[in-house]
Design a protein with these regions (language model features):
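A generic short alpha-helical patch detector that favors 3-5-residue windows
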Residues: 31-32, 166
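N-terminal beta1-alpha1 ligand-phosphate binding loop
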Residues: 2-31
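Surface-exposed, flexible loop/turn segments at secondary-structure boundaries
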Residues: 21, 41-43, 129
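Short loop/helix-cap segments at secondary-structure boundaries that form the rim of catalytic
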Residues: 24-28, 45-46, 72
């Protein structure tokens, strides 16, 4: 957890996620933030568009943390919720695999295919939703051999990543092409939209020490 040291009058930022990738993005932006795990079970309702699933989950995560914080502090709190859903061109959602065999199956299906990642962002301040956004990223995987897939899954263990690979790490070795306006959205958090939203909220931001 990052200890929030924002100047009096600034907002306290709270990330409603234990995702190391999202924490790394915020840390790289020199934002000071706290981390609180959400009490929310991600939904995957049949028939619901993937972009909507991502938004529902982000709202649920941020909302659960905002409810925890309600009445606990006089600070101006902004809760950041985010989720990511991956689907194939045919519309099949590739959920977090949860097992090695399922990850191998997903990557086998996705080999030489275009995938779309929907990364959502929800900001809740003092109980009110201030921003709700979904960013899409297109990724083309190389034609992968069975050996490449099994070796990658064993080495990188992407069992809790949508699409069964870590694009911010060794998963890049599986990729042929990326189309996105914000690479951070592919990594799990639409950072450009987040920063724009914070500016629009007239928040001066609390920067971590530059040293």
């Amino acid at each position: 957890m990052k200890k929030n040291q924002s100047i009096e009058g600034n907002s306290t930022l709270v990330l409603a996620s234990e995702s190391s990738a999202r924490q790394s993005i915020l840390t790289g932006l020199k934002l000071v933030f706290d981390v609180i795990a959400p009490d929310f079970s991600e939904t995957a309702q049949p028939g619901v568009p993937p972009a909507e699933i991502a938004l529902i989950n982000a709202k649920g995560k941020a909302g659960s943390v905002a409810a925890k914080l309600a009445g606990q502090s006089e600070a101006n709190v902004i809760v950041i919720g985010s989720d990511q859903v991956c689907c194939t061109d045919s519309g099949m959602v590739l959920h977090k695999p949860g097992s090695r065999d399922r990850a191998i199956d997903q990557l086998t299906q996705a080999s030489d295919q275009w995938l779309t990642f929907y990364s959502s962002l929800v900001l809740i301040r003092n109980g009110m939703v201030e921003r709700a956004h979904v960013e899409s990223c297109a990724v083309k995987l190389r034609r992968l051999t069975n050996l490449e897939i099994k070796t990658y899954v064993t080495a990188d263990n992407p069992l809790w990543s949508a699409g069964s690979f870590h694009a911010e790490g060794a998963g890049l070795r599986l990729i042929e092409k990326i189309e996105t306006t914000d690479i951070n959205a592919l990594y799990g958090l639409p950072a450009l939209v987040l920063l724009q939203a914070l500016r629009e909220l007239n928040d001066p931001l609390a920067y971590a020490a530059w040293s």
